[in-house]
Amino acid sequence: MSRKVFLVGDGAVGSTFANDLLQNTTVDELAIFDVAKDRPVGDSMDLEDITPFTGQTNIHPAEYSDAKDADVCVITAGVPRKPGETRLDLVNKNVKILKTIVDPVVESGFKGVFVVSANPVDILTTLTQKISGFPKDRVIGTGTSLDSMRLRVELAKKLNVPVAKVNSMVLGEHGDTSFENFDESTVDNKPLRDYSEINDNVLSEIESDVRKKGGKIITNKGATFYGVAMMLTQIVSAILDNRSICLPLSAPINGEYGIKHDLYLGTPTIINGNGIEKVIETKLSDVEKAKMINSADKMQEVLSGVEM
């Protein structure tokens, strides 16, 4: 394996991811493409300056033909969410951009794994698979992994424990129909609901805080990028290292949870060097299962109206 990454989109998320990736795993080659041609030139030179500490990497601006021998193609390119916008508001803008990316990457001869983080990520991951014609296990989206990290942070703050001791996930759409899987959540291997500080009102407040956090970050600084860049780093590192990890990602649904639609949605997913190793149907209450189906129905409704 050449340990080559082809990055499409060198904005705030893309450049932060590139920096994080180089500091967290070995990368032989990082090829960066952006429609703003000057930016990858500048970032390639800037990132070179950390290689005395991170190890030797061939970092360079790229064209789509450079995707041919990459192990991973990371798609961060797209119109970012503005204050007051939902992720779904971005659909038709970013679908048009997506097609201009996926087609030439496939035409280059790329045979690796697509990793998508552009929003709305469940929709764009589904469409990346359909446009590319790739096997579903070789297309992955960041899904609800960032939402889940935000949930863990909020629970850790509430219970005054290290975040590493919190095991909790957000499932469904990376967006307004997502939901927290509180019944299966644990803190220091103890069920979350066993803690005296936790009740339905507290959980409702935490759920609201998690859902609103992205919008608050955008209102205050214009964009979110540190969190999602680190999630991308975890995903891509696992692929390059051929290391199995489980994260709540946009994964292909094949009847799990009683969902009838052919789409990608946030669910626990084991990935490795080949892409998706296993999609896990986690235990849900009847209420949570109804929320999962509702999330899928909403995504299908949006997909049905997409202008390709």
UniProtKB/Swiss-Prot annotation:
Q: Which GO terms describe its molecular function?
A: L-lactate dehydrogenase activity
The broad enzyme category this protein falls into is: oxidoreductase
Disulfide bridges in this chain: none
For this UniProt record, the keywords arranged alphabetically read as follows: Cytoplasm, NAD, Oxidoreductase
Task: Tell me one GO biological process term.
Answer: glycolytic process
Any stretches that span the bilayer, and where are they?
none
Q: Where in the cell is it found?
A: Cytoplasm
Which InterPro entries does the entry link to? L-lactate/malate_DH (IPR001557), L-lactate_DH (IPR011304), L-lactate_DH_AS (IPR018177), Lactate/malate_DH_C (IPR022383), Lactate/malate_DH_N (IPR001236), Lactate_DH/Glyco_Ohase_4_C (IPR015955), NAD(P)-bd_dom_sf (IPR036291)
Q: Which PROSITE patterns match?
A: L_LDH (PS00064)
- Is Endoplasmic reticulum there in the keyword field? no
**Annotated Gene Ontology cellular component terms:** cytoplasm
Listed Pfam families: Ldh_1_C, Ldh_1_N
Reactions accelerated catalytically: (S)-lactate + NAD(+) = pyruvate + NADH + H(+)
> At which positions is substrate bound?
R87, N119, P120, V121, D122, D147, S148, M149, R150, T224
According to UniProt, this protein's pathway is:
Fermentation; pyruvate fermentation to lactate; (S)-lactate from pyruvate: step 1/1
Catalytic center residues: H174 (proton acceptor)
Question: What Enzyme Commission number(s) does the record list for this chain?
Answer: 1.1.1.27
The UniProt record gives the binding positions of NAD(+) as: V13, D34, R39, Y64, G78, V79, T100, T142
The entry assigns this protein to a family as follows: Belongs to the LDH/MDH superfamily. LDH family.
General function of this protein: Catalyzes the conversion of lactate to pyruvate.
Tell me, how does this one assemble?
Answer: Homotetramer.
This one is known as L-lactate dehydrogenase 2
